[in-house]
Amino acid sequence: MQAQRLPPTARLTGPTVRLDPLGPQHFDDTWAWVNDPESARLTGTTTIFTAEQVRTHLAAVASARDRSDWAIVDRTSGTYRGEIVLNDLDATNASMNVRIALAPGAPGRGIGTEAMTLVLDHAFADLRLHRVALDVFDFNVRAQRSYRKAGFVVEGRCRQTFRTADGWADSILMAVLADDPRPTLR
């Protein structure tokens, strides 16, 4: 990975989900869950977004070349299931961050694991990245399990990074390297 810019976001297709480049056409689906309290809790989002902020964000990510944002779509029903993002491009070190947010009702079906596997296949085979990292709150055990299934390993823990209604949550740092063993859908 030498370029400071990514190629245009590609559509990625797996057995049960399709990842479409995220853009303004996804406003209604995004708006339907972006301020959902449980989604906010799991992602650590403390902002209540306005419709205008969501529209501006979707327009910006559609043309960004330092990140790739996808809508997660169920291939059978065409239902929007969330979004997944490769961001924080470090071209010198061929690394990026990944984050995923599933819409209410989507978790627990393998959708997130499949979407993550598709993005990792793309990151390592097409973008030639060396490392993809993420962080997840310690209380989000289901997400941690999904990330391990996709090939991520725990690299560390940052203590008490997020205040919850019950106290403090730690952030678990996870990453996967291009040559780490992991499942593939290709």
Task: List each language-model region with its residue ranges.
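Amphipathic alpha-helical recognition patches that constitute DNA-binding helices
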Residues: 29, 97, 114, 131, ...
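Short glycine/proline-centered loop/turn elements that form peptide/ligand docking sites
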Residues: 112, 116, 139-143, 160-165
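Conserved GNAT acetyl-CoA-binding A-motif
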Residues: 125-135
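Conserved catalytic-core motifs of GNAT/GCN5-like acyltransferases
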Residues: 22, 133-136, 153-173
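Conserved acetyl-CoA-binding loop-helix of GNAT-fold acetyltransferases
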Residues: 102, 108-123, 144-149
